[in-house]
Regions:
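Catalytic beta-strand/loop module used to bind and position nucleotide/cofactor moieties
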Residues: 1-2, 6-133
Length: 133
């Protein structure tokens, strides 16, 4: 149920971590948009947050994606994860990214039940489009 993408990118040509994180956010947000999910990133909370799905606003934003990177000698490690259809009960046992008072969601919980292959096709297209270094 959770799609995790580890990107090992040489950032030596463009040594700008904020730009790199913004690209990871854009890939996530644009992928979700293809499935009629409106999501955003927030300056005060790490991750990708759903505000609207299938033309319905959520009462409170829910986290659908995480971003975690490590940089060593300007080579990126780790990357993003997006919740397609995981068992959300496991998330009740943890404090995702150390953020309290917010729930975690998935495409499936939002009423979008797709095969991982379909999700992967869209995600890969967005990575190819935006990950230009």
């Amino acid at each position: 149920g959770q799609r995790v993408v580890y990107l090992m990118i040489n950032l030596n040509k463009k040594k700008d971590l904020r730009y790199f994180v913004s690209i990871l956010e854009k890939i996530s947000i644009e992928t979700l948009k293809e499935f009629n999910i409106v999501s955003v990133s927030r300056n005060d909370r790490i991750g990708i947050w759903v505000t609207k799905s299938n033309n319905k606003y959520l009462k409170k934003e829910k986290k659908i994606g995480a971003i975690g990177i490590r940089i060593k000698k300007w080579i990126s490690f780790h990357g993003i994860s997006l919740n397609v259809k995981p068992d959300l009960n496991y998330f009740k046992q943890i404090n995702a990214c150390g953020i309290k008072n917010f729930e975690v969601t998935s495409l499936k919980e939002l009423g979008i039940d797709i095969k991982m292959e379909e999700f992967d096709k869209v995600l890969l297209a967005k990575i190819k489009k935006y990950m230009v270094f």
